[in-house]
């Protein structure tokens, strides 16, 4: 067992579900970057399993001080790479290395609500690595939550809404700018999003993905996804509230986008704001704020 009692850490405010801490927190062995990479290669399978069981794993003590160090550690785990260029993320981000990019370049006053990464698209990663290069003097924590726990509580507190989400799925709509908009949390241009240079190429990609679309007079592009699932079967008896419902309904707001038009059920019917508030309140209840320290690494299972 790699993660024995000597490796385990206690983090203030840590949650516990079914006798398992969330997140699991461990201390990596001390050493140089090469030794950290060797450690990562040795624990890759167990760390992935732990992230699935616990939801997330916080690792402290790795010798990571730069995006390049982070890239080296991530490469050592040898998980499949899911690059920013390959994604359909609507967030504007900066690539530092082929595997490392910023979480979001929106101004700090923009609220980014809890969500599963890229679940508003048909293409999404199974895991996410986060790294803290410099800890904030104040604030700066990253909230994460167990969506399997959220789903169980939503079914208890609002079964009709939970049933509708499960049966109908969701569709998302947003307007992509013709040029990058760094003032928005969703300011990635349609050219960057779809890796194209022309409208014709964008339309071909959209058609292949099953999207509908409408060009705006100013060159922006309004798109609507095909029906996407709101709930994911985790294959071990658990299900998770796997979507971007809360983030889209409450947070997809900028000069182009109105949250009220950002999401519907799969059949086109509107969501009841009161139902979304219940889901959001539960998410906040089960959320844990990662108290970053410089050099911390976190592995989050995007499905859980």
What function would you assign to each model-found segment?
Residues 47-57, 78-81:
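Acidic, aromatic-enriched beta-alpha/helix-loop junctions
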Residues 64-79:
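Glycine-rich loop at the start of a catalytic domain that most often binds anionic cofactors/ligands
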Residues 1-39, 46, 52-53, 108-113, ...:
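Active-site environment of non-heme Fe oxygenases that use a 2-His-1-carboxylate facial triad
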Residues 81-116:
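A gly/proline- and charged-residue-enriched helix-loop-helix capping module
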Residues 61, 302-303:
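Conserved "cap/hinge" positions at secondary-structure junctions
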Residues 80-91, 214, 291, 297:
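Polymerase palm active-site segment centered on the conserved acidic dipeptide of motif C
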């Amino acid at each position: 067992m790699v993660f024995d009692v000597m490796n385990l850490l206690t983090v203030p405010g840590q949650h516990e579900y079914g006798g398992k801490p969330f997140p699991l927190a461990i201390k990596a062995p001390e050493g140089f970057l090469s030794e950290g990479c060797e450690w990562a290669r040795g624990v890759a399978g167990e760390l992935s399993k732990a992230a699935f069981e616990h939801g997330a794993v916080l690792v402290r003590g790795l010798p990571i001080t730069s995006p390049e160090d982070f890239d080296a550690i991530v490469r050592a785990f040898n998980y499949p790479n899911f690059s920013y260029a390959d994604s359909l993320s609507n967030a504007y981000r900066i690539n530092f290395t082929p595997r490392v990019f910023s979480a979001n370049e929106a101004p700090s006053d923009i609220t980014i609500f809890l969500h599963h990464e890229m679940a508003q698209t048909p293409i999404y990663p199974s895991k996410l690595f986060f790294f803290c290069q410099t800890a904030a003097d104040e604030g700066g924590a990253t909230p994460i939550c167990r969506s399997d726990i959220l789903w169980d509580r939503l079914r208890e507190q609002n079964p009709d809404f939970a049933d509708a989400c499960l049966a109908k799925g969701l569709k998302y709509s947003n307007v992509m700018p013709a040029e990058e908009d760094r003032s928005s949390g969703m300011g990635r241009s349609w050219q960057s999003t779809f890796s194209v240079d022309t409208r014709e190429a964008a339309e071909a990609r959209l058609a292949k993905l099953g999207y509908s679309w409408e060009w705006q007079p100013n060159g922006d592009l309004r798109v609507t996804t095909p029906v996407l699932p709101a709930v994911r079967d985790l294959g071990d008896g658990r299900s998770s509230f796997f979507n971007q419902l809360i983030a889209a309904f409450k947070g997809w707001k900028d000069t182009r986008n109105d949250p009220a038009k950002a999401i519907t059920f799969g059949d086109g019917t509107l969501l009841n704001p009161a139902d979304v508030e219940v889901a959001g309140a539960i998410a906040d209840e089960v959320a844990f704020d990662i108290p970053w320290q410089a050099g911390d690494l976190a592995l989050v299972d995007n499905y859980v």
